[in-house]
Amino acid sequence: MFTGSAALNLDAKGRLTMPTRYRASLIDTCGGQLVLTLHPFDDCLALYPRAEFMDTAKKLSEQRDSNPQVRQLKRRFLGQAAEIEMDGSGRLLVPPELRAAINLEKRAMLIGQLHRFEIWKEESWADVDGTLDPAALPESVQELSF
């Protein structure tokens, strides 16, 4: 389970170092085998343990290609996916095309989303964080007890 957030630095080789608190879980759940792709709706990257990505990809692949938006979603989510491996020091190489897609240069925010992570350019995260409009949430979410 991945929760919480962390500010990360991108090194000169385009690598991010996973916080220590997530490393053992990533080794246990996926042997450090991950998939990094463009988030389908937000200006960030989505980082999945490989099996979790495959489950999501299977569900998406079952959607009919007759809808042009479904085809575009598949292109973004599946077509931009890169299999990556966490090295022994907890580093992940972010492919140049994915860095360029979100203008990721030096600072990033890692945001836990339970079964996956989001990786945001630090400035983009600052723009998005705190913009929640509770009134715009579905009633089923508003009724949750926090």
From Swiss-Prot:
Domain SpoVT-AbrB as annotated: residue spans: 5-52, 81-124
Principal subcellular localization: cytoplasm
Keywords: Cytoplasm, DNA-binding, Repeat, Transcription, Transcription regulation
CDD domains associated with the record: MraZ_C, MraZ_N
Alphabetical list of Pfam families matching this protein: MraZ
Compartments where found: Cytoplasm, Nucleoid
This protein's GO CC annotations: cytoplasm; nucleoid
GO BP: any one term: negative regulation of DNA-templated transcription initiation
One function term, GO molecular function aspect: DNA-binding transcription factor activity
Subunit composition and interactions: Forms oligomers.
Protein family (similarity comment): Belongs to the MraZ family.
Protein's recorded name: Transcriptional regulator MraZ
Organism listed in the record: Alcanivorax borkumensis (strain ATCC 700651 / DSM 11573 / NCIMB 13689 / SK2)
Name of the gene this protein is made from: mraZ
